[in-house]
C-alpha cells in the first residue's frame, strides 16, 4: 500500500498497480491519497492503516514533509501504525541536537569531515549545507575556500532565491572530502544478528554533472553560473573488494553505537554515505547518514545481495523477508517499533 499526496498518485494507480488479467503485473495493492502528506497523522488515516494491518516503512519524504508541521516527539507518538525499524532513530538523521548523526559517528569512531562553527574558521575547501529557500525539506550546497568566498557565494545565492539568511545561519560548514562518493547501503537483521551490505550506489546531482560534461574551451561561458549539487537520482556502483572489509567494520561499529545511543538501535536498512579518500591507503570518510530505506532503488543491481542470498534482492523484498521471518518465529517485537 502506498500513501501519497494528491497529484502524485497516477504512477501508483495506473503504472505500478497490481492486476491479474490478462497477465499478473504490478506491485501496488492500494493507494491512500491525501491533500498533503502530513495528513497521515490524522486519526482517521491512522485507523484506516491499522484496519489494513499495515507495517509502515518510512522514507525520506515521510520525515521531511511531516517535519514541516510536527516535531519528532509528535511524529513518534502520533504515528500509531507499527514501524519497521526504529522510529526513535529517525531524528538522529538531523545535524543538530545532542544525539544527531555526528554523535553516533563519533561514538562509533567513524571518520567524518571536520566541521567549522563559523565562516571565519574556514581553512581550505569546505562544503556548506543549508536548507533550500524554495524547497525547505531539501538542502542547498555550495563550496568555498575562505570566509570571503563564503560571503560572496552566500550573498549571490540569497539574491537568486536559493538560500535565505535564516537558513544560512544554521548551515553546516565542513571540510570538503576529495574523492569518488559511494553510499554503503546496509541492512541490520536483529533476528539473525548480522549486518548485510544490500548494495552500493552514488548520487547524480544537478547541475554538477552538466559542468563535468562541458569541454574546457567552453568553461568561460559558465563563469556566472552557480554550481548546484541537488539530488536528481542515483547510479549503481561498486567498490574495490579490498574495501569491503573496512566497509563492514564501519557498518558494525555504527550499529553498536546506535544501539547504545538510540536503543534499540539500527533495525533494517540504513546507509553510510562516504567519500573514498586517495590515501594511501584509501579510506572511507562518512559525510552523511541515512537512517531509513535508501533513496536508490537500483542497489539490487550491485552484486552484494546475490553474494549473500544467491540472487538479487531489493531492499523492499529484504524488509518483507525480515517481517515474514519475525512473524513465523513470533519475534515481530524485535523488528517493529
Regions found by a protein language model. Give the residues of each.
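Short internal beta-strands
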Residues: 2-7
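Conserved N-proximal alpha/beta basic substrate-recognition cap immediately N-terminal to
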Residues: 8-123, 133-134
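Charged, glycine/proline-rich intrinsically disordered loops and linkers
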Residues: 13-32, 209-247
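Well-ordered, non-membrane alpha-helical segments in soluble/globular domains
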Residues: 33-44, 67-73, 98-99, 150-157, ...
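Active-site ExK catalytic segment of metal-dependent nucleases
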Residues: 101-102, 129, 201, 287-292
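ATP-grasp fold ATP-binding core
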Residues: 105, 115, 123-144, 161-179, ...
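Phosphate-binding site of ATP-dependent enzymes
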Residues: 147-227, 242-246, 250-266, 271-285
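ATP-dependent carboxylate activation and anion-phosphoryl transfer catalytic cores
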Residues: 235-337
Amino acid at each position: 500500500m502506498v500513501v501519497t499526496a494528491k497529484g502524485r498518485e497516477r504512477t501508483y494507480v495506473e503504472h505500478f498497480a497490481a492486476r491479474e488479467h490478462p497477465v499478473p503485473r504490478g506491485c501496488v495493492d492500494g493507494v491512500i491519497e491525501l491533500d498533503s502528506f502530513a495528513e497521515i497523522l490524522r486519526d482517521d488515516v491512522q485507523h484506516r492503516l491499522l484496519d489494513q494491518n499495515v507495517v509502515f516503512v518510512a522514507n525520506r519524504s515521510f520525515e521531511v514533509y511531516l517535519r514541516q508541521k510536527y516535531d519528532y516527539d509528535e511524529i513518534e507518538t502520533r504515528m500509531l501504525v507499527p514501524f519497521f525499524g526504529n522510529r526513535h532513530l529517525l531524528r538522529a538523521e538531523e545535524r543538530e541536537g545532542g544525539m544527531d548523526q555526528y554523535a553516533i559517528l563519533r561514538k562509533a569512531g567513524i571518520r567524518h569531515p571536520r566541521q567549522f562553527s563559523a565562516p571565519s574558521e574556514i581553512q581550505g575547501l569546505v562544503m556548506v549545507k543549508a536548507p533550500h529557500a524554495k524547497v525547505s525539506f531539501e538542502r542547498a550546497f555550495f563550496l568555498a575556500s575562505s570566509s570571503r568566498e563564503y560571503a560572496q557565494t552566500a550573498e549571490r545565492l540569497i539574491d537568486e532565491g536559493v538560500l535565505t539568511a535564516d537558513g544560512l545561519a544554521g548551515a553546516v560548514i565542513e571540510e570538503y572530502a576529495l574523492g569518488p562518493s559511494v553510499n554503503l547501503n546496509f541492512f541490520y537483521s536483529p533476528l539473525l544478528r548480522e549486518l548485510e551490505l544490500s548494495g552500493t550506489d552514488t548520487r547524480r546531482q544537478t547541475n554538477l554533472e552538466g559542468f563535468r560534461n562541458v569541454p574546457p574551451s567552453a568553461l568561460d561561458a559558465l563563469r556566472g553560473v552557480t554550481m548546484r549539487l541537488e539530488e536528481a537520482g542515483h547510479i549503481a556502483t561498486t567498490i574495490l573488494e579490498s574495501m569491503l572489509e573496512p566497509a563492514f567494520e564501519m557498518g558494525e561499529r555504527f550499529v553498536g553505537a546506535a544501539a547504545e545511543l538510540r536503543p534499540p538501535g539500527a533495525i533494517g536498512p540504513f546507509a553510510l554515505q562516504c567519500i573514498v579518500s586517495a590515501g594511501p591507503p584509501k579510506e572511507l570518510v562518512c559525510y552523511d547518514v541515512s537512517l531509513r530505506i535508501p533513496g536508490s532503488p537500483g542497489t539490487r543491481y550491485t552484486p552484494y545481495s546475490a553474494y549473500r542470498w544467491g540472487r538479487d534482492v531489493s531492499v523492499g523484498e529484504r524488509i518483507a523477508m525480515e517481517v515474514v521471518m519475525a512473524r513465523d518465529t513470533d519475534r515481530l517485537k524485535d523488528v517493529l517499533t
